[in-house]
A protein has these predicted regions:
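Alpha-helical solenoid repeat scaffolds of the TPR/TPR-like class and their adjacent stem/linker regions
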Residues: 1-387, 392-453
Length: 453
């Protein structure tokens, strides 16, 4: 499973604001070694191979790179083959390609990044760090190596180090797609007494996870009179954040440009823990968001009319950037069918298909997501149910931010924020993490979840 940064690097099609899903999933890969195969770079065959990679046709791209490599043993072409194989889920072949590149060019930093990425995909993060460190030692400007190193540090729970290294995300290929803000304002240094603009970045899951740091920024700015903290917010989160305790001034995305002169400095949302000097053992606790309780009460009363079963909110589909996080509604309903007399399922999924809606109705489920216009609606539904079962999507982050009891269903390797081999999370105390073994299918994990409710 690869992160959205890889999609931005390779396909240039990243949509920073997704539907409820979204940070870093397991560490990102470097782009193909474009430019490493200097003898071939100008050839039409090389451009075609790069285009195939960018289009996501990794099998055809590998064939094209291998064809080029037959005429000259160019280590950059071998690196490109390795990334194709990594994207195709063939890490053993990828390792051989990266090692072959290093045999010809021991100082090729990108090949070391590739070896680190393979280790990280198998949750061998200490090994990954050693490979990334070699890449950085060979080429200090390796922003991709530093960014991927940050992801492994996150997986190991070394958050303070990870936050520092994660600043390299702005110097990676594809950064302009992931981080579209190019504000003519200096970066905030974490000091007080400034008119600060914090701006969102990445997907909704990442945003929700890091909203907890906004009240701390408000407090820091207020330490010296005259300062103010403002947050540029994606519209689907606007109403929910206006109810957030200790929130900054909320500005809808797209409305801030004319007011840029009102601010002295800016900061990306995911840089706040670094700028604020936060510690891993003192993360802001949950809940830090509040649902519209009257709206939640109305939903709860409607759903419980003449029905005493407990309500379980469900979300089964994650972002299209990482389809391996998703399962099918049919599998979820089948696993919970033996408890149908005790539990009633409430879909928290937006835009379900007609087939899914019919299947949900057949099992006496509730399609709450049909009425979702914003995350405030989702939050009210989360507050109305008794518990939640969700794959790794923004719904799970929102449930955690609201401190709702949640079973989080994870495939492996899971996103680094969830850390390997643990059942709890320092980010959300109300979440229990259930992990799908590599040899299991979702049904095994779903049956376990059904017994835990």
């Amino acid at each position: 499973m690869f992160s959205r940064l890889l999609a931005a690097i390779t396909r240039k099609t990243y949509r920073a604001i997704e539907e409820p899903q979204a940070n870093p999933a397991p560490p990102t890969q470097a782009p193909p070694g474009q430019g490493q195969e200097n003898a071939h770079a100008a050839r039409p065959e090389a451009q075609r191979a790069h285009a195939l990679f960018d289009a996501g046709d990794y099998s055809a791209a590998r064939d094209a790179y291998e064809h080029l490599a037959q005429t000259q043993a160019a280590p950059g072409l071998m690196v490109n083959c390795g990334y194709c194989e990594l994207m195709l889920g063939e890490p053993d072949k990828a390792r051989k390609s990266f090692e072959a590149a290093l045999a010809l060019a021991p100082h090729l930093a990108q090949a070391w990044v590739g070896l680190g990425d393979i280790a990280a995909r198998h949750n061998r993060h200490e090994e990954a760090l050693r490979a990334y460190d070699k890449a950085i030692a060979l080429e200090d400007s390796q922003g991709i190596a530093r960014n991927n190193r940050a992801q492994s540090l996150l997986a190991l729970g070394r958050l303070e180090e990870a936050w520092r290294e994660n600043e390299a995300r702005f110097s990676t290929p594809g950064a302009t797609a992931l981080y579209p803000h190019r504000l003519a304002l200096p970066r905030w240094d974490g000091g007080a007494g400034r008119r600060l603009l914090v701006h969102w970045e990445q997907g909704f899951g990442d945003i929700i996870q890091h909203l907890r740091f906004l009240p701390l920024a408000v407090q820091r700015i207020a330490q010296v009179g005259g300062g103010s903290c403002n947050f540029e917010c994606p519209p689907p989160l606007l109403t929910l954040l206006q109810r957030m305790p200790g929130a900054p001034t909320i500005i809808a995305a797209g409305e801030m440009a004319p007011e840029l002169s009102s601010f002295d400095c800016q900061a990306p949302l995911l840089s706040l823990p670094l700028l604020l000097g936060c510690r891993a053992d003192a993360l802001p606790s949950t809940p830090y968001l509040r649902a519209d309780q009257p709206a939640a009460d109305v939903l709860g009363q409607a759903w419980r009319q003449r029905d005493t079963r407990r309500l379980v909110g469900i979300a089964w589909r994650a972002s299209s950037f990482d389809p391996q996080r998703s399962l099918t509604l049919a599998a979820l309903l089948a696993a919970f069918a033996p408890r149908a007399t005790e539990l009633r399922l409430v879909s928290l999924q937006k835009d379900i298909s007609a087939e899914e809606r019919a299947l949900l109705t057949l099992h006496e489920g509730i399609d709450a997501g049909a009425n979702f216009d914003s995350f405030d609606d989702t939050a009210a539904a989360l507050a109305a149910v008794d518990s939640v079962v969700s794959v790794d999507t923004a719904v799970a982050h929102l449930a955690g931010a609201l401190a709702r009891p949640t079973l989080l269903l994870l495939n492996e390797p899971a996103a680094v924020r969830w850390m390997p081999d643990v059942e709890d999370s320092p980010w959300y105390g109300s979440l229990r993490l259930l992990r799908k073994n590599a040899n299991d299918d979702w049904e095994v994990l779903l049956r376990r979840a059904a017994t835990l409710l």
